[in-house]
Amino acid sequence: METIQAIRSRRSVRKYQQRPVPHEVIEQIVADAAYAPSWKNTQIARYVLVEDRATIDKMAEEMVLDFKLNEKTLKNCPAVMVLTYVTGRSGYERDGSFSTPKEAGFEMFDAGIAAQTFCLAAWERGVGTVITGYFDEEKITRLLNLPENQKVGCVIGLGYPDEEPAAPKRKSVEDLLTYK
C-alpha cells in the first residue's frame, strides 16, 4: 500500500471480526510505529496490548466515562492497545526545564504522532483501529499496573474489520490552508 493510499483509506473501525490478531503482526506494527517522529528522538510511546476478554469488558464498562459508543466499540474489539507515554522527557531539557513554550503538552503531541503511525502501520496489514480518548486514566493505570512515569495517551481498539466504514466528508483545501 502506498503512503497516500493508506492515509486516505484508513478509517475508524468500530465493528470487528472476533479472530485475534497474531502477536507477530502486532510486533510488526509496533516496530513500524517506533519510527514515529518524536521530540529530540525521545521515543516516549509505549504499547500495552490487552487481549483478555474480561479486562477489555471491564475497561469498556468502567473506564470510558459513560460514553456509550466507546463502551460498545471496545466490547466488540478482539484486542485493545493502550498507548502510554513516558513523562518528563518530551519537551524537556536534561536538567528538567522545558525546551518549548508548549511545556508538557509536547508529550501528548508525540503520543498523537505515535498513535497515528501505529494506526497506519496496522491498516497496512489489514488491521483496523479506532482511537479513543475519553477514558478514566487513573482506573486504567491501576488496572494495568502502569509504571509511575507513564501516562495513558489513548486507547486504541483493534482487530480485523467486519465492515468497511464509509469515508467521512473532508474539508476542502481552501478551508484548511492559509497563505501569508
Question: Whereabouts are the PLM-identified features?
Answer:
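C-terminal helix-cap and adjacent tail motif
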Residues: 3-12, 89, 153-180
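Short beta-strand segments
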Residues: 31-32, 36-37, 43-48, 117
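Small-aliphatic-rich amphipathic alpha-helix that forms the alpha element of a beta-alpha
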Residues: 33, 81, 87, 96-143
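Solvent-exposed alpha-helices and their adjacent loops that cap or buttress functional pockets
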Residues: 39-42, 73-75, 146-148, 169-170
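Glycine/small-residue-rich phosphate/adenosyl-binding loop
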Residues: 41-111
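Short, conserved aromatic-histidine micro-motifs
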Residues: 139-159
